[in-house]
UniProtKB/Swiss-Prot annotation:
CDD domains: ABCC_MRP_Like. This is Nisin transport ATP-binding protein NisT. One of its GO terms (molecular function) is ABC-type oligopeptide transporter activity. Its main location: membrane. InterPro entries: AAA+_ATPase, ABC1_TM_dom, ABC1_TM_sf, ABC_transporter-like_ATP-bd, ABC_transporter-like_CS, P-loop_NTPase, Type_1_exporter. It is found in: Cell membrane. The gene is nisT. The lineage of its organism: Bacteria, Bacillati, Bacillota, Bacilli, Lactobacillales. One of its GO terms (biological process) is protein transport. GO terms for cellular component: plasma membrane. It comes from the Bacteria. Keywords: ATP-binding, Bacteriocin transport, Cell membrane, Membrane, Nucleotide-binding, Protein transport, Transmembrane, Transmembrane helix, Transport. Residues 352-592 form the ABC transporter domain. ATP binds at G386, K387, N388, G389, S390, G391, K392, S393.
Length: 600
């Protein structure tokens, strides 16, 4: 999709092959309302033909003998009432169907996005796809279905009107089809161009969203204000938006030129047709009522033709989108097709072995990890140290199942990671990430999200809060677990960075897991809080596998075993004293840290 391809009839029909899949998806999600809309539109489609015949008879009766005039007026009134009722009913059902379908598809999309791998979210192309499918899914599927229904309804009404004109002159009826066919070809070309432009600018649209996000949230406000860079971002936003406007105006100009050209041809045909009808009236071959109804029929043909062209344009344009949506939804069915064994998921893990492990990030040729061999045992506290970029965080993401190894294996009590279902990692591993989430939710939710089955066990929540010293969450010397945290919502309580980190730690420890992993757990903590956390972590490691990443070698000294990493490889493994004697790289890290501490 990197370049605009020339529109062809073959490509057009190939794109329309998504229609059966679209209809199948819609009927799976909202079958009842889809049927309601089809029935209502089918009934409505035949009303115009009935109206033409009634209107014709009404005028001829008024100008003629007046026989059956009352009956015709009553029938005309009934038809108008039915038309109004059907229109209102169709509008209500259509609105309800739109809302329900949008909800159902968004739920499906969220399930798909939640089943993606972490590596998917580390690629810009995936963000662009997610941006487009989530943004357009709120209206495109309904727009496509509605366009199909209206297209069929308009087609029936068009044939009815052509049949009505054909009763006077079949040649004129055929002539009136020229403009719709010509319009179709021209507008489909524009439709393809419009879709490709919108799809290709997904990255830029995401950039505008990000700028708005920066300018409207507290986390970035301080730097933007102090550095006086709001105008920089506003200018950047305006430049991108102007580019979008210029692209949209170019498409609008093309549509306008086509419309002017087609309207000229259409009006020319209409004038010639009406002139021929007038000649027939003057020759006594056509009644006035017939003339008026035929002119109305021509007007309806023009209306239905334009409606059909617009809807074919919409069908084609939205079908291009649906191709991308279906490609994205397929990801849900291919992710984590592994053995599903409840017993495996629930057993307590005692050993993790990393064997000949190497990892290369997508779209990269460099090894982030290379030939890693390690073991982690229950009852053992392991620290992983090294400079930034040494592969520490990548390693724990592989151990926790967020990445799959490029080469080598991970064994959990001799069970290979490649065969483990996602549920295994979710039940057995609890991780504090360096970029932990600050949930703008209640205390209960902030802690209980790691184990939803225990979210309403107040005693369990309070116990972990007390163990980690989260007294700052108390109100009148007690925890009110439904207190809102953060300042995004009403009655929220703002917290410091260190307080948010302690809450994230409490959430990590609240989960009953076999393996606990902390990535820079003391980055925002004061010395007292750091000691409390590590004391609790050491106690926790007696019956579990416990791993933590740290830049601080003083913190690492608390571990039974220290893994030293350098440039994606394991430099050495041992206790602090052993490493200080035999590992030159560890010595460099240690003395560098001591120098910095003394310098302070």
């Amino acid at each position: 999709m990197d370049e605009v391809k020339e529109f062809t009839s073959k490509q057009f029909f190939y794109t329309l092959l998504t229609l059966p899949s679209t209809l199948k998806l819609i009927f799976q999600l909202e079958k009842r309302y889809a049927i309601y809309l089809i029935v209502l539109n089918a009934i409505t489609a035949f009303v115009p033909l009935a109206s033409l015949f009634i209107y014709q008879d009404l005028i001829n009766s008024v100008l003629g003998s007046g026989r059956h005039l009352i009956n015709i007026i009553i029938i005309y009134f009934i038809v108008q009432v039915i038309t109004t009722v059907l229109g209102q009913l169709e509008s209500y059902v259509s609105g309800k169907f739109d809302m329900r379908l949008s909800y159902s598809i968004n739920m499906r999309l969220m399930r798909t996005t939640s089943s993606l791998e972490l590596s998917d979210y580390e690629q810009a192309d995936m963000y662009n796809i997610i941006e487009k499918v989530t943004q357009d899914s709120t209206y495109k599927p309904f727009q496509l279905f509605n366009a199909i229904i209206v297209e069929l309804s308009s087609f029936i009404s068009l044939l009815s009107s052509l049949f009505f004109i054909g009763t006077w002159n079949i040649g004129v009826a055929i002539l009136l089809l020229i403009v719709p066919v010509l319009s179709l070809v021209l507008f489909l070309r524009v439709g393809q161009l419009e879709f490709l432009i919108q799809w290709q600018r997904a990255s830029s649209e995401r950039e505008t969203w990000y700028i708005v996000y920066l300018l409207t949230h507290d986390f970035s406000f301080k730097e933007i204000k102090l550095n006086n860079i709001s105008n920089y971002f506003i200018h950047k936003f305006g430049k991108l938006k102007k580019g979008f406007i210029n692209q949209d105006l170019a498409i609008a100009r093309k549509k306008t030129y086509f419309n002017i050209f087609l309207d000229f041809i259409l009006n020319l045909i209409n004038i010639l047709t009406i002139f021929a009808m007038i000649l027939s009236v003057r020759a006594g071959k056509l009644l006035i009522g017939n003339l008026v109804s035929l002119i109305q029929a021509i007007s309806k043909i023009n209306t239905y033709s334009q409606t059909m062209i617009q809807n074919i344009y919409i069908i084609y344009n939205t079908s291009l989108f649906m191709e991308q949506l279906f490609e994205f939804l397929k990801r849900e069915s291919v992710v984590h097709k592994k053995i599903e064994d409840t017993e495996i998921c629930n057993q307590h893990i005692g050993t993790v072995k990393v064997i000949n492990l190497s990892y290369v990030y997508p779209n990269s040729n460099a090894f982030a990890l290379k030939n890693i061999n390690l073991s982690f045992e229950k009852g053992e506290l392991t620290a992983i140290v090294g400079k930034n970029g040494s592969g520490k965080s990548t390693l724990v993401k592989i151990i926790s199942g967020l990445y799959q190894p490029t080469m080598g294996i991970i064994q959990y009590d001799k069970m290979r990671s490649s065969l483990m279902p996602e549920e295994f990692y979710q039940k057995n591993i609890s991780v504090l990430f360096q970029d932990f989430v600050k949930y703008e939710l209640t205390i209960r939710e902030n802690i209980g999200l790691s184990d939803l089955s225990s979210q309403w066990e107040d005693e369990k929540i309070i116990k972990v809060l007390d163990n980690l010293g989260l007294d700052f969450l108390k109100t009148n010397n007690q925890y009110v677990l439904d207190t809102q945290l953060g300042n995004w919502f009403q009655e929220g309580h703002q917290l410091s960075g260190g307080q948010w980190q302690k809450i994230a730690l409490a959430r990590t420890f609240f989960k009953k897991a076999s393996i606990y992993i902390l990535d820079e757990p003391s980055a925002a903590l004061d010395p007292v809080a750091e000691k409390e956390i590590f004391d609790y972590f050491v106690a926790l490691s007696e019956n579990n596998i416990s791993i933590f990443i740290s830049h601080s070698l003083n913190a690492a000294r608390k571990a039974n075993k220290i893994v030293v990493m350098k440039d994606g490889q394991v430099e050495d493994v041992g206790s602090h004293d052993v490493l200080l004697r035999r590992c030159q790289y560890y010595q460099e890290l240690y003395y560098s840290e001591q120098y910095e501490d003394n310098d302070e």
